[in-house]
Amino acid sequence: MIQRFEVSKRVHSAYELRDGRVKSNGDYRAMDLYLRLGEVLAGRAEAGGYLPALNALLKCLDTLCSQRDMLDASQKARLAWLLEAEARLVEAARISQASAAAHIDPPALPGDLGAFPHVALLAADTMRSRGYAQALAAHGATLGRVVIVKMPGGAQRLGQSDAAPSSADWQDEYFVPDLDIPLEETCKALSDDVVTLQTGTINAPDVATALPADAFGFVIYSGFGGELVGREVLERSAPLLHMHAGWLPDYRGSTTTFYSWLRDGAYGASAIFLSAEIDQGVILGRKRYPPPHAGVDGDYLHDAVLRSDLLLSVMAHLAKTGALPAEVRQKANEGETYYIIHPVLKHIAILSGEDA
């Protein structure tokens, strides 16, 4: 039910199972449906601090509060109870976050990584891609090909920003990129074969054509935020190595960084080969990192630094042994899938850096 609501932000009066999938049916405008969902979510969130339920509750209450003038007296009383429950649950999440502490893995400090002629980089023009490219280049890596995907006409997607965040307040011993440096400039140092595509999407046919499976052992993947890789690219290109911002299988889905800060007091990252099932590919490495210190940008800089560190760990293993780390297969019924975090919970998570 959480999944259905998170995807559509609607609660329907009926659902049916059709062809193995749950389909929405019936009315979705009755506020009693949202009140009842809110009550169920509040109960689930109070029973063990279940963050997916709290996140959905906050979004459900946004809908209810926007329609408050349309509620009758009984419905307003139920809404008032839910708002009191929301305040308790958010405060409990804040206190839980303040007491969270987790093991932190040391940074990767590899020497000269060397040449990887059968490895390519697929990089959307984002801050994270700049971090990956600079981390590899700074440690002496060269690749067989780099494919850069840009937005036509200067448009922007998730993961892109006109203003690069400052790294002046960074306090840990990780490689820190200069995100002002254009991606193309760094990629020219990584490979003699740089292809730039103005497709605006990873899922264009030209992308898969540029990264054939018979030419490369695998492709380091850094796409646009929020864009899922389509089946055609997965089937036609060499395997895509992705640094997921979450400790798998515990944290699948979206904005898992912030949920992890709330629950564990740490940032997890997992190196996986992408598969058709979201965040369920084989795992080749995992590391835990501290949340950002006060003054450090969490959306772009912190994310780029720590995912780049995991990438360096994987590539250092390949350089040293001639093989990627051993694969760990995930089970579909393990872990948790998260959805875009509500701004209230995101703010609490960000404050973890202020207290670090």
Residue ranges and their predicted role:
Residues 10-55, 59-356:
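One-carbon transfer enzymes
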Residues 2-11:
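N-terminal leader/linker segments that initiate helical-solenoid repeat arrays
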